[in-house]
Amino acid sequence: MAEITNIRPSFDVSPVAAGLIGASVLVVCVSVTVFVWTCCHQQAEKKHKTPPYKFIHMLKGISIYPETLSNKKKIIKVRRDKDGPRRESGRGNLLINAESGLLSHDKDPRGPSPASCMDQLPIKRDYGEELRSPMTSLTPGESKATSPSSPEEDVMLGSLTFSVDYNFPKKALVVTIQEAHGLPVMDDQTQGSDPYIKMTILPDKRHRVKTRVLRKTLDPVFDETFTFYGIPYSQLQDLVLHFLVLSFDRFSRDDVIGEVMVPLAGVDPSTGKVQLTRDIIKRNIQKCISRGELQVSLSYQPVAQRMTVVVLKARHLPKMDITGLSGNPYVKVNVYYGRKRIAKKKTHVKKCTLNPVFNESFIYDIPTDLLPDISIEFLVIDFDRTTKNEVVGRLILGAHSVTTSGAEHWREVCESPRKPIAKWHSLSEY
């Protein structure tokens, strides 16, 4: 009798591997279930309450919400009453929907006042600065030029003690900055100063040194000696020691306390060390009749309603301090509607030159009807890494131009659309 054999299917997967696969499938299923449940739970919560993630970023007073981050901000003119009687201000009506960035028509037949128009501009708070007119910005009591009896001249800035010596074998000038007394308070919180001194030998300006910073004192004792080699004794009479006294500021640019100028023509260190004490005086910013010239080009595209401003170059800019260490100019361009600033841009800094070439262009969206009320201000500024920047001069083109050349340039731009018009303009005092 034949033998019957039962053939059963065999599997190569071991029990351990099968267990791992099963566990993995179980973990995936549980994860998917938890994810779906979480999404459904969040959707249900959003329908019943305000989302908790709404936030506000403060960028100089502007609130930006998530739902409006993608909106564009444009300066757009709704209408200008040409046929009707003009308001006393003589300015057009400017309305902008801050939520959508689109036009909103003025339903008031009289139109909003210029002030209300500017309040609706979706622009930064500091853009609301007023345009300072050279004729009206300063009253006689607010003149920038300090009169002899002004309080600024009466402020005592302290004194500086130092010594001058000459090393004949090494042909070296030796200057020791010893101490200062009676410095003014530069930090209201600590009622003190963090003084240090920068020293420069004029007029070549090749030798520049500075002391360490002494914290919270009005009577610093530096006692630091600096040796300048390669200075023949015969040239000492032509040199001037310039001491600039500053107060260190951790969070902003250092404050200038004052300066001391010492011509070596009246000092004879041939017989030994000469000790001197000089009063610290207010920093002497050079006043000059000419502020230099600036060349700019303007062109207006009426179809695109865009104004292209090109800052080309400047020439004959003055040195802004007596040391002649300045000469890092850049140009800041401000656009005003009426007297409210609505846009600002600036060029790059040009290092160590009084005749800079910029060749930088800026584009502004300006409706045609707004041109009579638009002014463009150019501020030529001298960049200073240590102290505050100083305005070299100013030029205004447009509605508030105070010069004949500025008014003529603006008129040509408005009457010759699509044509770039470049002109030189003399800078005025800011």
Swiss-Prot record:
Cytoplasmic topological intervals: 37-430
Protein name: Synaptotagmin-11
Transmembrane regions listed in the UniProt entry: 16-36
PTM (free text): Ubiquitinated, at least by PRKN, and targeted to the proteasome complex for degradation. Ubiquitination is inhibited by ATP13A2.
Organism encoding this protein: Mus musculus (Mouse)
Gene: Syt11
Pfam family, one: C2
Calcium keyword on record: yes
GO biological process: autophagy; calcium ion regulated lysosome exocytosis; establishment of vesicle localization; learning; memory; negative regulation of cytokine production; negative regulation of dopamine secretion; negative regulation of endocytosis
Entry comment describing in which tissues the protein is expressed: Expressed in cerebellun, cerebellar cortex, hippocampus, olfactory bulb and spinal cord (at protein level). Expressed by neurons, astrocytes and microglia (at protein level). Expressed in macrophages (at protein level).
Cofactor: Ca(2+)
Main location: membrane
Intervals, Vesicular compartment: 1-15
